């Protein structure tokens, strides 16, 4: 490119693309090419609604600037494929999204950044937000002054490769790879292998027949009841939805929106080992705990923003919190005591919300912190929908060793 204050350069894109296709016909041309497009940011984040069938004309096509102006869009627009937008377009393009991000703070090598390589937890999150959101991932790994990839970068890439292979090697859903032809309102149940722990849902469309899903919901059957664990809009080649650990016996998928008949090629459930990003402070609450207060007891240690302080009581006592204002709660976090003695760690629970502190609604959750006895890290429970609430209540049902003790290192609420 021209660089800062550089002279504007003109490129013969037609000749460049023809040369690529002649010499490397299977090469993927990005951004100025018409195979994949830039997602619109360099933070490793795909859109939650991502259409590969889009009204965005490739930049190299004649008249693209006029089309962008007429439709009011560019590569960074949030909406590139809605029905409303497509209805205004004269052409539609199969132009999938490419998420671009660097494994380091910048795109080029700097020795002082050798210890600033993205953590495995961060890269896995990027994978879910890119490949898991119907995009391809371009992960930049800059060569060092030797012309080689630095050892730290190579180590992290190997870790990422092994983590992804291990996570998605074994689909726990029985017959999940059979084609399901469905329309809006259709529901399909799948059996899950017995005695397996899962926390990641996968759904794929047969994109040789196009991209058509506009909305879907996911429920798992566990502990004798169906639980809503997630929902999404577009699917495309692949959509991944993480949810709280569950010993699911069945999974149920419902198509809530579609452009005609949809062709689902794969349904999967997997278990992704939890990762803690040691390079970053784990945020347990999306809502600041300042101004929170517990109701009916002194349990300040559970809401002081410090995992190392613990509220403990010698009974299975519900923890009630007044947040001081109403928010839309999408889930909650529970951190057990960060010490060797795990007595009081909650295993099974109920979670309630209230707008006035009097009338309570039980939230739809699996109701257990699976494997917390052997992996006592913070657990994040997402409901798959939101509840308006000023108050919330965590009710312990059983402790990990069936003792009448409750311990909370920290509790928080999630907004997304």
Where are these regions (language model features)?
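C-terminal luminal/periplasmic domains and tails of membrane-associated envelope-modifying transferases
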Residues: 199, 282, 307-320, 331, ...
